[in-house]
Every structure is written in C-alpha cells, then in structure tokens.
C-alpha cells in the first residue's frame, strides 16, 4: 500500500489535541507544544510572514478590560480620587 488514498483510511489517531492557552486543536500530543500559540513557551508564537494571524490575536481583539480605560486616565493625569490642595489666589 502506498501513501496515497488507500492509506488515508487507516489514519485514526489524533496527533493534535486542544491547547490550554489558545483553545485550538493544535497542541501536539507527543511534542507537547502548540503549533498555533507555542504553549508552553512563555511568549506567544508569532511570525512576520503570518500578518493575518497577528492581526487576529493582537491587543485590542479581546475585551481589554483594563487597557480600555488607560487612554482616558492618561489624558487626565491618572487622578487618584484625592482632591488637590487649594492654593491661595493672589
């Protein structure tokens, strides 16, 4: 039997399973690495030749629960909620 159509029916073992970090079915069972995000490496896997993939998973594509408000707080000088001391006017 060759490596073509007849042999494809005999393939039934999964080489990839779900990844804990990205949730895709890209975690290689034997290598123990994710082909999509690079888990368990500390840094996320990203390549310049995959610009579309970068765009899909970059900052701003999720909830941004904290970052959403940083620009507004920056404009106001990161106020802490404590009133400024009154300076006597001349």
Swiss-Prot record:
Q: Which InterPro entries match?
A: Ribosomal_eL37 (IPR001569), Ribosomal_eL37/eL43 (IPR011331), Ribosomal_eL37_CS (IPR018267), Ribosomal_zn-bd (IPR011332)
Q: Which of this chain's residues are annotated to bind Zn(2+)? A: 19, 22, 34, 37
For whether the record's keyword set contains rRNA-binding, the answer is: yes
| Assigned keywords, A-Z | Cytoplasm, Metal-binding, Ribonucleoprotein, Ribosomal protein, RNA-binding, rRNA-binding, Zinc, Zinc-finger
* Superkingdom of origin organism: Eukaryota
A20-type zinc finger locations on the chain: 13-46
Q: Which gene encodes it?
A: RPL37B
Q: What is the lineage of its organism?
A: Eukaryota, Fungi, Dikarya, Ascomycota, Saccharomycotina
Q: Where in the cell is it found?
A: Cytoplasm
Molecular function GO labels? RNA binding; rRNA binding; structural constituent of ribosome; zinc ion binding
User: NCBIfam families recorded for this chain?
Assistant: PRK04179.1
Protein name as it appears in the record? Large ribosomal subunit protein eL37
Question: So where does this one cross the membrane?
Answer: none
Question: Which function does this protein serve?
Answer: Component of the ribosome, a large ribonucleoprotein complex responsible for the synthesis of proteins in the cell. The small ribosomal subunit (SSU) binds messenger RNAs (mRNAs) and translates the encoded message by selecting cognate aminoacyl-transfer RNA (tRNA) molecules. The large subunit (LSU) contains the ribosomal catalytic site termed the peptidyl transferase center (PTC), which catalyzes the formation of peptide bonds, thereby polymerizing the amino acids delivered by tRNAs into a polypeptide chain.
GO cellular component terms, A-Z: cytosolic large ribosomal subunit
Quaternary state and partners of this protein? Component of the large ribosomal subunit. Mature ribosomes consist of a small (40S) and a large (60S) subunit. The 40S subunit contains about 32 different proteins and 1 molecule of RNA (18S). The 60S subunit contains 45 different proteins and 3 molecules of RNA (25S, 5.8S and 5S).
Could you give a single Gene Ontology term from the biological process aspect?
translation
Question: One Pfam family this chain carries?
Answer: Ribosomal_L37e
What family is it from? Answer: Belongs to the eukaryotic ribosomal protein eL37 family.
Keyword Metal-binding: yes or no? yes
Cofactors, names only: Zn(2+)
């Amino acid at each position: 039997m060759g490596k073509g159509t007849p042999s494809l029916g005999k393939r039934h073992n999964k080489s990839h399973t779900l990844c804990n970090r990205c949730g895709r079915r890209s975690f290689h069972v034997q290598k123990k690495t994710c082909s999509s995000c690079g888990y368990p490496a500390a840094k996320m896997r990203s390549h310049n030749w995959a610009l579309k993939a970068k765009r899909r998973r970059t900052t701003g594509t999720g909830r941004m629960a904290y970052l959403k408000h940083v620009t507004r707080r920056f404009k106001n000088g990161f106020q802490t909620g404590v009133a400024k001391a009154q300076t006597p006017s001349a």
